[in-house]
Amino acid sequence: MMHRLNLNGYEPDRHHEAAVAFCIHAGTDELTSPVHQHRKGQLILALHGAITCTVENALWMVPPQYAVWIPGGVEHSNQVTANAELCFLFIEPSAVTMPTTCCTLKISPLCRELILTLANRTTTQRAEPMTRRLIQVLFDELPQQPQQQLHLPVSSHPKIRTMVEMMAKGPVEWGALGQWAGFFAMSERNLARLIVKETGLSFRQWRQQLQLIMALQGLVKGDTVQKVAHTLGYDSTTAFITMFKKGLGQTPGRYIARLTTVSPQSAKPDPRQ
């Protein structure tokens, strides 16, 4: 079952603090939010579980210890896994220099703890000089967080959208460019050119990036490496591990083990306090 993601009545754009943060827990069901935008820039940090953000030209996957940065004014929607714990950080547009486009950031332990500490501050505490100093340290650290390629380029082109939706639902059935060319009644060459034009990647690269995102979604939920490999249509677990390591630099087991080495601080304050 899927429920709507909400911010407990909190409306970040009505506040003019340089930065404000709070955390939420998804509960036992997946959560989703419709397309929306904020005046403020938004950083979504995954503590447990994962979140997938959809913007006009890409899908952004956010596993634990990572965050997605969404500049102010960018329309987006979110899908959160069951039992996920997330921290939202809203930043005034002129408060700190951040990327002008969406990106996934690998968040350092220091930066993570600064965000969680800010999330635990009450309304009264947020007005104190100590909080302003904390925010300044956070602003010194945030621009230095390395960007990661945990996104799938897409576009508004109906063929590209159809391919994403159908490959996500049936990755085993839709693995070859020739299948898609037949489905769209066009030549493989023309379809390959369209994919490069719309995404900047070849079909093989684009499909592999989708597989990486789907693999992370499955692994974060607790699926075994063998199950994920089978779901994605790999004949052997070894072949899947090779693809995963090539894309993310580590085997699936080591990657997930690293994501779970840090236990998140319990931080679920009511942002209206």
UniProtKB/Swiss-Prot annotation:
Inducing or repressing factors: Negatively autoregulated.
GO molecular function: DNA binding; DNA-binding transcription factor activity; sequence-specific DNA binding
Signal peptide: none
SMART domains reported in the protein's UniProt record: HTH_ARAC
Example GO biological process: negative regulation of DNA-templated transcription
UniProtKB keywords: DNA-binding, Repressor, Transcription, Transcription regulation
Gene3D superfamilies listed in its UniProt record: Homeodomain-like, Jelly Rolls
Annotated ranges, domain HTH araC/xylS-type: 158-258
DNA-binding region: 178-199, 225-248
CDD domains: cupin_NimR-like_N (cd06124)
Pfam families: AraC_binding, HTH_18
The keyword Repressor is assigned to this record: yes
Cross-referenced PROSITE patterns: HTH_ARAC_FAMILY_1, HTH_ARAC_FAMILY_2
InterPro entries: AraC-bd (IPR003313), Homeodomain-like_sf (IPR009057), HTH_AraC (IPR018060), HTH_AraC-typ_CS (IPR018062), RmlC-like_jellyroll (IPR014710), RmlC_Cupin_sf (IPR011051)
Function: Negatively regulates expression of the nimT operon and its own expression. Acts by binding to the nimR-nimT intergenic region.
Protein name listed in UniProt: HTH-type transcriptional regulator NimR
Species annotation: Escherichia coli (strain K12)
Lineage: Bacteria, Pseudomonadati, Pseudomonadota, Gammaproteobacteria, Enterobacterales
Encoding gene per record: nimR
